[in-house]
Every structure is written in structure tokens, then in C-alpha cells.
């Protein structure tokens, strides 16, 4: 890697950073050689009701798998985000909220947030929610979403947040899997000037014949729009809060008691409920937030992620609030009503740390830097990227136009399953290279293996695995532990398989190359190809479908569908649009195929297995070197697909 593409740590950052390069190397070495001692020390960064004495009991053996951290200690996640700050910082701003319309502004101090959470925790109890119950949250990006999460944590209920862009069918599958007794939603959401019918989506989801677990739906009034009302089931948020007590003692939870479920795409088509527990997750979310963003007291921190994704959980709610940060929450999207919105919000709220996604950076880049002519940006100190690998062009644009070449960029790699950041630069310690996630966080042991599971050393490429546990790791797939073992620990024995490929350069820096399984990454959000295929095949005119990702200028990966129609069906543009709307309704807008290519046949082996590598290459317009097609039952299919491909370069 040439020195021209190496960005040195700015001297003013290095002088005041939490750790420099020498300290990073020393701490990292200690965390690997003596994990017990390292995490014993750092486990005490949060408050424990009963202090832990046992630190780590873990095994990645697929026949005898166990993951336990701080496992004889007790604590409460809500108390760690709120109560611990009240003595000295009750009047400090916890949340600054800006609505879709910039005129809508609200703030909550730590004292006010504590009161709201205690009241809503009591409200949940009044509706029959008990410790260990699953509560589904389907909310817009409003402070009440964080209040609902923290209230669940306060009483030991398990929250399951569903992204507001998901369809009724997706909501229903998550409600059924979690066996939720209570759903929390709003009348409507507002996003980029559009009204999102949240309550109507919940009503449709709960009308699903297999949903019979939900007893109550709590509705927050966001817009005041007309909504359907089910007497005896539906209840207004405000009416519960009006009568709820402000006092609620935090439930004493075991470190390994569940904190939340979050569903992520699986390659089998059924979303999997990733289960995170309380102690290790809180330690890891708080520690990574402080070290990766070099967080300093009294800084304003803005993570643009939706609360429905793991980034919103770890780096908008639990991590920052455990550290006593002031968090900016934005209801809309940072490029509405114009691309200048992001810069306006940074300047308006004097944001010091910005954490956003490559897909947004690319969208802003496409609009041109003149959109930021009036942007000051002097408050910004650290910038982060999350959700997918950031391409070097977007990295440089982010650095130059938003960061004014003075803010270190932390390109973070992690997953829903990991609970927190695993590979990332540290602002005062790591010289950066555009497009590289660089080096592992403390306690994280990445490795590259070939397809046989042999570890490859030095500068090389392979499957990215992690060799030992870290505190933020998921513990199981809810209700399906066998699937957890099979998905993550059977492919490469004794290792956690990330599902991603990576390269390691001569400096030991990691470069994530993308998914190696059948999951695609659209705008930083993971979608299982099987899920989209299942939705397409459910249409009466579709006989077969194969879905792959392809390079997309804005979204990173777009969705490319090859569709074989039933006999007698006619390939028309109208049907193409109908199928796009069909998938949108079945799964949600995120899953809408960008391109649908009619396919008379698909490339299959003689055993009937679809050879996706050919489909990926054709979708990516890489048709000159497709590789060996001798195993195909009908190699001529390939020629036809190449001839009729849609993603041609001009």
C-alpha cells in the first residue's frame, strides 16, 4: 500500500486522544494474552448491583458451545444509562431531537429521560408485562422509541425493535417468533415528507392468522392522523403516562439474562432473532463507543442510524447513554428536504462526532459538494462510517467535504451478531487508509481462513473468522440454538464465521470484501436473498426466482432478480413493475428489486443447484471471464442471460 494513501493521525487529535498507537498496541496485546485480567478491569466501567467475580467462560467448539461473560454479576441496563448519571448530571442533555421538519425540536435531560422511562416502565407493568416477556417496538425515530427500549430493560422485559420500513408480513413473522404480548407503535411516522402508516401496518400484521399472542397495543400520538382503533386492545401512550408513577426500581438482572432480540436476515429466508444479553453487551457497547469515537465528556454525538438496526441500539441508545453523552436523534433522513440538511444539522447542534453510512455519503456525493457551500463544520472532531465497506472515493469525499481534512474517519466493521464494533481505527492511534477497517478492537482476534478452514498468514485474502469470544457477542438465535451453532460455528470448526470475506495487507490492515453467503447488503442493511426469492415466487405468475446483489453507485449493493415466469405468462414492463410492488408489500421498500431480468432458465448443476456465481457476475456486468461452466446441466442458459442482461455499462 503506497504511503500516498495513508492518512496520518492529525497531531491535535493524537495529543488529546484516549489512546495513542503505542498504548493501543500494549492494550491489545494484553487483551489477547490475558483476556481474563483485561476484561476484569474494563468490566467495571459500568455499575453492577452484585459485582462479578467470574469473567469469561467461552468455547467455540460446535459440539460444546458456550458463551458467558461476567456471569455471576447482576446489573440493570436502564440504570446504567440513566440512574448512574443523576447525582452529577441530572440537568445534562441526554437527547436532542429534531423532527423531519427542522422546526420540530425537543430536548430531554438525563433527569427528564429517567422520569419518562420510570413512568413508561410502570405503564408496561400495568399492561401485564413481566420480566422475560418479549415486547415488540415499531416506532418512528422519536425519543419515545428510546424511552420504550429503556423501560423494557428497566423491568427485565426483552425488547424486539422492528425497523419502521418493514411490511406487515415482516412484522407478523417477528411478533410470532418472539411470542410478543405487547406491541408499542405510533399512529403514524414522518420521513422525508411522507407519512408512514405505522398503526395501520401493525393492525394488518396482527390480523395474520398465526398471530394470537398480542394482548395490548400501546399507541403514541405522533401526527394525530386518523387511525383504526380496536377497543380493549389498543391504548394511548399518553393515557398510560398520565397515571403512571415516576418511581420504578430497576430490576436486578443476571449478566446473562436477555436484554433484547433483533431480527436479522438469514440465508434460509426466515429472519433470525439475534439474542443479546445484559452484562457483556453493556460493557462492550459502552467501551467501544468511548474508545472508537474517542468520546469526551460534554460532546454532542450524532448517529444517523435508525433505532430499528443494531447501530441504533448500540451507538444511539445503550453505548452513548451509558457514557453520559448528549445524543442527537433525527426523525427524518439527513438529505431531506435538500442534501444540505446534514451540514445544517451538524452546525445547528454543534455536533462533535458524526456516525453515518456510506450509502448516505454516496448520495450526497452525487449531489455535488456545492450543496455544502454554506457548511461551517468547525464543531466536528471525529467521523465514522458503518453498515458496509466504504469505497475509497466516498471515503475521500467524506474526509474532504464534510471533515474539512481535519477529522479522523473511523471505518467500523461489525454485525448485528457482534453487538459492537470489532474492527476499526482508533482516532488517536491508527493511521488510516481509505476503504480499510484497519485493526481489531481490544480482545478481538480476527483471522483469515481458506475454504478448508486453514488459517492463512501475512498479506492474504480469505474468509473472515474470529478465533475467540468478546463480551458483546450474541448468545443464541432465539428459540433455535441449533441454527446458531450451524450458522456461525459449523463452517469452520472452533471459529466464529462472520459470513464476510476480507483481505489483509502487508501492514496487517483488514479490508472487508463483502458477503460470501447468500446475504446482500443494501444501503447498509442486510437482506437474505432467499427472503426476496420467496416473496417473488409467491406471485402467481412466477415459477422461479434467483436474487443476487450487484454494485450500485448509491446503495453499495442493489437487488438484481432473475425471474422465470409460469407457462403462458407474458413478459411485460407492467408485470415487472407489479413484481417490484409485490416484493415491496411482502417484505418492505428496502427489499424492492432494482432490476428484474426475465430468465427462460437459470444456470443449474445436474443436481438442480443454482450456480449463483454466474448470476452475480452477469448482474455485475462482468461477463468476459465467467469461469468453468462444464458442471452446468445446460451451459447455453448462460449465453441467453448475458444477451438479455440489464446492467450494461453505457
Swiss-Prot record:
PTM annotation, UniProt: Acetylated. Deacetylation by the SIR2-homolog deacetylase activates the enzyme.
Binding site for CoA: 191-194, 311, 335, 523, 584
Record-linked InterPro entries: Ac_CoA_lig (IPR011904), ACAS_N (IPR032387), AMP-bd_C (IPR025110), AMP-bd_C_sf (IPR045851), AMP-binding_CS (IPR020845), AMP-dep_synth/lig_dom (IPR000873), ANL_N_sf (IPR042099)
Pfam families, per database record: ACAS_N, AMP-binding, AMP-binding_C
Sample GO molecular function, one term: ATP binding
GO BP term (any one): acetyl-CoA biosynthetic process from acetate
Residues that hold ATP according to the record: 387-389, 411-416, 500, 515, 526
Class of the enzyme per the UniProt entry, highest EC level: ligase
Residue runs in coiled coils: none
Keyword Metal-binding: yes
Annotated catalysed reactions: acetate + ATP + CoA = acetyl-CoA + AMP + diphosphate
Needed co-factor(s): Mg(2+)
One Gene Ontology cellular component: cytosol
Entries under PROSITE patterns matching the protein: AMP_BINDING
Similarity-based family: Belongs to the ATP-dependent AMP-binding enzyme family.
Name of the protein this chain belongs to: Acetyl-coenzyme A synthetase
Organism: Shewanella halifaxensis (strain HAW-EB4)
Gene field: acsA
Amino acid at each position: 500500500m503506497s504511503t500516498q494513501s495513508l492518512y496520518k493521525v492529525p497531531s491535535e487529535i493524537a495529543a488529546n486522544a484516549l489512546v495513542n498507537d503505542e498504548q493501543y498496541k500494549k492494550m491489545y496485546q494484553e487483551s489477547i494474552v490475558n483476556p481474563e485480567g483485561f476484561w476484569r478491569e474494563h468490566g467495571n466501567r459500568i455499575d453492577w448491583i452484585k459485582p462479578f467475580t467470574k469473567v469469561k467462560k467461552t468455547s467455540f467448539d460446535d459440539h460444546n458451545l458456550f458463551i458467558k461473560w461476567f456471569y455471576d454479576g447482576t446489573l440493570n441496563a436502564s440504570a446504567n444509562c440513566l440512574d448512574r448519571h443523576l447525582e452529577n448530571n441530572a440537568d445534562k442533555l441526554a437527547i436532542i431531537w429534531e423532527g423531519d421538519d427542522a422546526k420540530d425540536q425537543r430536548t430531554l435531560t438525563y433527569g427528564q429521560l429517567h422520569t419518562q422511562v420510570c413512568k413508561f416502565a410502570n405503564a408496561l407493568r400495568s399492561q401485564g408485562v413481566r420480566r422475560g416477556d418479549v415486547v415488540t417496538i415499531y416506532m418512528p425515530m422519536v425519543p419515545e422509541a428510546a424511552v420504550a427500549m429503556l423501560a423494557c430493560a428497566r423491568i427485565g422485559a426483552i425488547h424486539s425493535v422492528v425497523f419502521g420500513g418493514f411490511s406487515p408480513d415482516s412484522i407478523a413473522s417477528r411478533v410470532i417468533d418472539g411470542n410478543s404480548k405487547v406491541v408499542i407503535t405510533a399512529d403514524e411516522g414522518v420521513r422525508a415528507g411522507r407519512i408512514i402508516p405505522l398503526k395501520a401496518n401493525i393492525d394488518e400484521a396482527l390480523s395474520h392468522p398465526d398471530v394470537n399472542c398480542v394482548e395490548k397495543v400501546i399507541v403514541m400520538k405522533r401526527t394525530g392522523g386518523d387511525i383504526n382503533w380496536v377497543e380493549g386492545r389498543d391504548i394511548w401512550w399518553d393515557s398510560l403516562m398520565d397515571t403512571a408513577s415516576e418511581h420504578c426500581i430497576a430490576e436486578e438482572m443476571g449478566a446473562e439474562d436477555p436484554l433484547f432480540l433483533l431480527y436479522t436476515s438469514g440465508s434460509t429466508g426466515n429472519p433470525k432473532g439475534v439474542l443479546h444479553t445484559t452484562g457483556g453487551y453493556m460493557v462492550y457497547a459502552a467501551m467501544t463507543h468511548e474508545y472508537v469515537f474517542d468520546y469526551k465528556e460534554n460532546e454532542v454525538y450524532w448517529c444517523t442510524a435508525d433505532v430499528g438496526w443494531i447501530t441504533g441500539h448500540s451507538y444511539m441508545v445503550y453505548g452513548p447513554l451509558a457514557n453520559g453523552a448528549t445524543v442527537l436523534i433525527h426523525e427524518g433522513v439527513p438529505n431531506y428536504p435538500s442534501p444540505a440538511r446534514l451540514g445544517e444539522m451538524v452546525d445547528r447542534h454543534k455536533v462533535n462526532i458524526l456516525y453515518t453510512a456510506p450509502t448516505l455519503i454516496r448520495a450526497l456525493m452525487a449531489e455535488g459538494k456545492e450543496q455544502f457551500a454554506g457548511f461551517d463544520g468547525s464543531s466536528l472532531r471525529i467521523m465514522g462510517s458503518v453498515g458496509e465497506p466504504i469505497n475509497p472515493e466516498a471515503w475521500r469525499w467524506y474526509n474532504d467535504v464534510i471533515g474539512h481534512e481535519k477529522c479522523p474517519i473511523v471505518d467500523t466493521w461489525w454485525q448485528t451478531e457482534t453487538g459492537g464494533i470489532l474492527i476499526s481505527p482508533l482516532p488517536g492511534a491508527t493511521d488510516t487508509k481509505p476503504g480499510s477497517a484497519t485493526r481489531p478492537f481490544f480482545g478481538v482476534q480476527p483471522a483469515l481462513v481458506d475454504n478448508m478452514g486453514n488459517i492463512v498468514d501475512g498479506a492474504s485474502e480469505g474468509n473472515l473468522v474470529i478465533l475467540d469470544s468478546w463480551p458483546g457477542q450474541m448468545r443464541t438465535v432465539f428459540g433455535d440454538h441449533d441454527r446458531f451453532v450451524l450458522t456461525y460455528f459449523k463452517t469452520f470448526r472452533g471459529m466464529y464465521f462472520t459470513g464476510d470475506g476480507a483481505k489483509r495487507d502487508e501492514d496487517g490492515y483488514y479490508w472487508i470484501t463483502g458477503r460470501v453467503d447468500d446475504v446482500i447488503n443494501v444501503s447498509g442493511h442486510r437482506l437474505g436473498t432467499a427472503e426476496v426469492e420467496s416473496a417473488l415466487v409467491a406471485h402467481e405468475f412466477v415459477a422461479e426466482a434467483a436474487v443476487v446483489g450487484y454494485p450500485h453507485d448509491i446503495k453499495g449493493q442493489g437487488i438484481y432478480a432473475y425471474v422465470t415466469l409460469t407457462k403462458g405468462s407474458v413478459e411485460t414492463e407492467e408485470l415487472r413493475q407489479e413484481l417490484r410492488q409485490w416484493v415491496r408489500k411482502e417484505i418492505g421498500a428496502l427489499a424492492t428489486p432494482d432490476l428484474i431480468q426475465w430468465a427462460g432458465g437459470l444456470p443449474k448443476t445436474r443436481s438442480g443447484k443454482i450456480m449463483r456465481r454466474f448470476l452475480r457476475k452477469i448482474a455485475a456486468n462482468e461477463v468476459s471471464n465467467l469461469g468453468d461452466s462444464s458442471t452446468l446441466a445446460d451451459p447455453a442458459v448462460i449465453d441467453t442471460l448475458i444477451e438479455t442482461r440489464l446492467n450494461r455499462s453505457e
